């Protein structure tokens, strides 16, 4: 019997080392002044930024879900990392936190250095958009756990907020206005249903034109999740904001109640915005009920802010100056906590 090696068992340490060699300079470009030391050690060191009286660390972890299946089918891996970062930084942003640093986890059947590099380029691009440093990560090669050519991603983000300025929804009051920021598409939620409709019901291929949009299926489904950090931080630093929500799995109806106190109800005017064509196509082709659409997809609204009525115009102007499409969706009323969709 020949002597066995780790490579013969399916784990290529040399490929892992080559991946690290490629991604370290990419990550280095994202570093903030608060990062102490370099990349590649056993742990990362990040000091809390100056200027805070009582800084609080705010953390979140998330993945990309089955949007990865579209990346596998198209062999396009350069933007999926943006989605990974977006899911985390938009979550800590909800509480008024500035994203500080990010770590990624890539698990795969076989390490392909070029593919790992493409993924991390996307992660770094997302970190640059979100203003946080990519300080480290883990790439795990597990041939007996993942199918050939497939991988999974997870991300972990830490942000910082002034304790006295944490946004937690407790100040939400009747008469407050609900503002919505346009999404870039499906973002990173609802893909199990979307893929079933697009590939099984409609029978489309990834290079086929997507109905109504003029884009390919691949371009439509791989459009990166929008990162709202910079314009939203500008708004919360200048104006009163009572609550915010990142519209992920559960949609508007599932996520907005998470930041509303008892006795507060959001009344959303469905006619306030035009639902993008991608969602209309999915609903019509899949014969999906309206309520199911709104609790599965973002329906064109990726982020929500609840603000005092007197501040609504000023907040809208600040967000618009930052490049956001802002929609006045409705208002807060007294009532059972939840969301009411009106025609």
Question: Predicted segments — roles?
Answer:
Residues 152, 165-217, 253:
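Short, acidic (Asp/Glu-rich) active-site segment that either coordinates a divalent metal cofactor
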Residues 2-8, 19, 115-133, 146-153, ...:
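Glycine-/charge-enriched secondary-structure boundary and capping motifs
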Residues 12, 62, 175, 246, ...:
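Residue-level signature of catalytic and energy-coupling elements of molecular machines
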Residues 52-53, 64-67, 162-165, 186-188, ...:
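Short, acidic Gly/Pro/Ser/Thr-rich loop/turn segments
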Residues 25-184:
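Glycine-rich phosphate/pyrophosphate-binding loop regions near the starts of catalytic domains
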Residues 106-107, 185, 310, 333:
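Short, glycine/serine-rich, charged loops/turns that create anion-binding
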Residues 1-33:
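N-terminal amphipathic/basic leader segments beginning at the initiator methionine
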Residues 53-59, 63-65, 169, 204-207, ...:
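Acidic-glycine-rich active-site phosphate/pyrophosphate-binding loop
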